[in-house]
A protein has these predicted regions:
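N-terminal beta1-alpha1 ligand-phosphate binding loop
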Residues: 2-15, 91-107, 111, 120-122, ...
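NAD(P)-dependent Rossmann-like dehydrogenase/reductase catalytic/cofactor-binding core
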Residues: 292-356
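GIY-YIG nuclease catalytic motif and its immediate N-terminal context
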Residues: 1-72, 77-82
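Rossmann-like NAD(P)(H) cofactor-binding subdomain of soluble oxidoreductases
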Residues: 103, 123, 133, 141-220
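NAD(P)+-binding Rossmann beta1-loop-alpha1 motif at the extreme N-terminus of oxidoreductases
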Residues: 88-139, 143-146, 278-280
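Small-residue helix-packing motif on alpha-helices
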Residues: 59, 74, 116, 126, ...
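Internal alpha-helical scaffold of NAD(P)-dependent oxidoreductase catalytic cores
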Residues: 188-201, 217-254, 266-304, 349
Length: 356
């Protein structure tokens, strides 16, 4: 497993060098004050350099070497890293629909709207979004791809082959193609890229709709052998959309079934809770707010406490109380089984979509 050497820039300008198997998770620990004592109280913190090493031992040796650098040498290292990354920053988005638009918004926040170009089958839709965000609209898909380092394909799976055949003449070495289509593997996508001038990097991202408000859960995977700069570049571009996590491609369909489809499973639950509130006497608007805020808070408890959801449930259920009575009613009606079956059904459909 790869390890990383990273440099954090603290709010007061201090540069902190460290190692981690997962830089984003380590950064989160620093931000919570659970990282090194040298970064506590010195926020905001930003990763300004990262370097991949083959193992932990190599990372520790590289960390020791960097720590011996003078500040000017560290700054030169950071500057070189930033310059290499900036050469790959311009992003094109093919498709401006419900899933494409949140990613476009994220990229505009990450690198500036001037570094983003969009194209859409219905040009008026692309123009409306561009007017809102300040990004450019390309004449067509190929023109968008030709001017970008990252080309995001935000189209439905059944449209992907046709879109790629149109883009192939504009794609080549030094570019990264990023698909958000469910079910379509890197192997399938690579086959449709035959004829490109060179070999663009190939990655997949699976977002969800909360990305529109910066609360998304996104998965990222890539074809074997993809350079780290492309993976890190996509992470940087999409970071404003929410949490971006690297996973194995074999887990993408399962991830999509849980996190991609999951919001549509939760919304009816919130609506049903609100309906229950109305039934027992709450005004509709208040019931909806209470239900939604409760789900938001419960999710935060799971993420921030580190406790198992079952433990958190037990902490609310007192013997003979109203909460355990409600939990029992859910169990009697197959609530848990229905949720599992929903994920399984979505997973099977994702696999069907990949059979092209």
């Amino acid at each position: 497993m790869s390890w990383w050497v990273y440099i954090l820039r603290c709010g007061d300008g201090t540069l902190y060098t460290g190692t981690a198997a997962d830089v984003e998770r380590r950064l989160a620990a620093h931000r919570r004050g659970r990282g090194a004592k040298y970064t506590r109280g010195r926020g905001p913190l930003a990763v300004v350099y990262r370097e991949e090493c083959p193992d932990q031992g190599a990372a520790l040796r590289r960390e020791a070497a960097i720590k011996k650098y003078r500040r000017a040498e560290k700054k030169a290292l950071i500057t070189d890293y930033a310059e290499r990354r900036s050469r790959m920053k311009k992003a094109a988005f093919i498709g401006t629909g419900n899933m494409g638009a949140p990613l476009i918004q994220a990229a505009c926040r990450a690198v500036g709207a001037e570094q983003v170009v969009v194209a859409n089958r219905t040009r008026a839709k692309a123009e409306a979004l561009a007017a809102e965000l300040g990004c450019a609209v390309a004449e067509d898909n190929r023109a968008a791809a030709a001017q970008a380092g990252y080309v995001f394909l935000c189209v439905k799976p059944q449209m992907m082959e046709g879109v790629l055949s149109e883009l192939v003449p504009a794609l080549g070495d030094g570019q990264a193609v990023v698909s958000i289509a469910a079910g379509l593997t890197c192997e399938t996508l690579r086959g449709w890229l035959a004829g490109a001038q060179g070999r663009p990097a190939l990655l997949r991202v699976m977002p969800n709709t909360p990305a529109a408000i910066g609360r998304g859960m996104l998965a990222l995977c890539a074809e074997a052998g993809t350079a780290e700069e492309y993976l890190a570049g996509v992470e940087d571009l999409l970071a404003p959309a929410g949490r971006v996590e690297r996973i194995a491609e074999g887990q993408m369909d399962a991830f999509s079934a849980v996190a991609g489809c999951g919001p549509a499973f939760v919304y009816p639950f919130i609506e049903a809770l609100a309906d229950g509130g109305v039934k027992v006497g709450l005004p509709r608007g208040q019931a909806m707010t209470y239900a939604a805020q409760m789900v938001l808070g419960a999710a935060a408890m799971v993420l921030e406490s580190g406790k198992h959801p079952g433990q958190l449930k037990d902490e609310v259920c007192s013997p003979g109380g109203s909460t355990i009575a409600g939990v029992a009613a859910l169990e009697e009606r197959g609530f848990r089984s229905a949720a599992i079956q929903a994920v399984e059904a979505a997973f099977r459909r994702n696999q069907e979509l990949g059979k092209v």
